[in-house]
A protein has these predicted regions:
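N-terminal cap/lid segment of alpha/beta-hydrolase-fold proteins
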Residues: 2-69
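Acidic catalytic loop of the alpha/beta-hydrolase fold
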Residues: 192-197, 224
């Protein structure tokens, strides 16, 4: 059971148990403090709130792109490179700026420990809880590389998840894909020229997943799928708009 209430301010928290393998990571009784946000405009046309979520495990930083009154939200996470990295030539900032026009809020999450699957999953769950505190009741998750396993683990923790997108996923940690919430739709994307994570990782994950599911393999595309950036954006956006219930198409 995941209990990460963002409204709480008590910092005396119990240690979170972890389970890896066929069961999803479980996070129990972690209380968090959400810092006041600051509006940032890093470049023309892009504006977001900087959100810092404090726990006894450290501070998780996020970029929040709000759609006023949205009931749907999307959390995006990267791979082991850390920071606010993005595949496909800036897929994440592009999506994050576009989704609010469809009444979907977006949150990009920076891992505290980008090589640690469990801690990265906690970060993703914290992101979902932050969106919940902003009125979001249905969630989509997008993850690249390690982030593919992260969003599968996070989705298996929360029945509010309606859409999952895994891009160039690793195999380790994807076992809970068979236990996603009922009706949660998962899209798996890989390049057949990926030399970092094998396309077989996505193919095996697809075989274990329940419907609705979709597998897309881009010919000649590598790990970051820069070669397919345009069509990847269209594919991911269409999946989110189709499976999040309150969106504007």
């Amino acid at each position: 059971m995941v209990t990460l209430p963002p409204q709480e301010t008590n910092r005396h928290n119990r240690h979170c148990p972890r389970m890896l393998g066929t069961a999803a990571i479980e996070v129990d009784a972690t209380k968090v403090v959400v810092q006041a946000t600051a509006r940032l405009v890093p470049q023309p046309g892009e504006a977001y709130d900087l959100v810092e979520i404090e726990t006894d495990r450290g501070t998780t930083a996020c970029h929040y792109y709000e759609a006023e009154g949205a009931r749907d939200g999307v959390v995006m996470v990267g791979g082991t490179g850390g920071g606010f990295d993005s595949p496909a030539g800036g897929l994440y900032p592009r999506l994050a700026q576009d989704l609010p026009h469809h009444r979907i809020s977006a949150l990009r999450v920076r891992y505290r420990h980008p090589t640690d699957l469990m801690e990265s999953t906690v970060d993703a769950i914290l992101g979902m809880r932050y969106l919940e505190s902003q009125g979001v009741s249905a969630v989509g998750l997008v993850g690249h590389s390690l982030g593919g396993a992260v969003v599968i683990q996070a989705a298996a923790n929360d029945p509010k998840v309606r859409a999952v997108v895994v891009i160039s996923t690793q195999a380790a940690g994807t076992e809970p894909v068979a236990r996603l919430p009922k009706g949660a739709a998962i899209l798996m994307i890989h390049g057949d020229a990926d030399t970092v994570t094998s396309p077989r990782s996505s193919e095996e994950t697809y075989r274990r997943a329940r419907e609705p599911r979709r597998l897309v393999i881009y010919e000649g595309a590598g790990h970051t799928l820069d070669e397919a950036a345009g069509s990847l954006f269209v594919e991911v956006k269409a999946w989110l708009l189709k499976h999040l219930p309150g969106t504007l198409v």
